Swiss-Prot record:
InterPro entries: Aldolase_TIM, RibuloseP-bd_barrel, Trp_synthase_alpha_AS, Trp_synthase_suA
Organism name: Mycobacterium avium (strain 104)
Protein name: Tryptophan synthase alpha chain
Gene from which this protein is expressed: trpA
UniProt-recorded Gene Ontology molecular function terms: tryptophan synthase activity
SUPFAM superfamilies assigned: Ribulose-phoshate binding barrel
Family of this protein: Belongs to the TrpA family.
Amino acid sequence: MTVKQSQASRLGPIFEACRDDDRAALIGYLPTGYPDVPTSVQAMVALVESGCDIVEVGVPYSDPGMDGPTIARATEAALHGGVRVRDTLAAVEAISAAGGRAVVMTYWNPVLRYGVDAFARDLAAAGGYGLITPDLIPDEAGQWLAASERHGLDRIFLVAPSSTPQRLALTVEASRGFVYAASTMGVTGARDAVSHAAPELVSRVREISDIPVGVGLGVRSREQAAQIGGYADGVIVGSALVSALGDGGLTALRALTEELAAGVRQRAAAS
């Protein structure tokens, strides 16, 4: 069975360019508002300047079911600081102005509160490429599917090792840009060992579609980035970048991003 993509992807040319360079794309996540709004925007621009191909701009949410402790603490601090959804849109504008490509990662409730079509409209106007929705499944995404078509945005849904063949096919068909493969079960966070379930999950997606696959949930080193970059189209890093920013500021964040960018260029074979 082959699952066809419905429309051209905004992110597609980025993955094509990375393939031409014989490497995976580096996709970095930071939450808006941590440690404060201005610094978070500077940090996202620093990701672009340090070799990040795509920036995931996080919308802090009070009930983050999938976030590990590092990101949960950062988003809690951002919420205490008064961060708003409009700050995320401003961050997207800043990334775009710096020559970067931004997607927003958000739980669905903030989008519902904002208004689905209004959010899609304003994200597109800010220069955003799409939306990652970790707690939204395609079956319940009718409003978002319609809004993404109207405003030309990519939609990135999650697949996991536990996804059934039917669920995998449905999710891949609804996705555009890339699919987000959770390389470990459970919440996000940097780990010493990268899940061995990830290569199999990527293979399962590739059996039914040529959509790019990004693998996340655990990467924190150049070696891990190289390992995942050997079989995935995108290497997604979140908790490790948040930790670097919190512990060492922009200098540490830049250093880690440069290390990870070197890692995806190593194309190490998956172990």
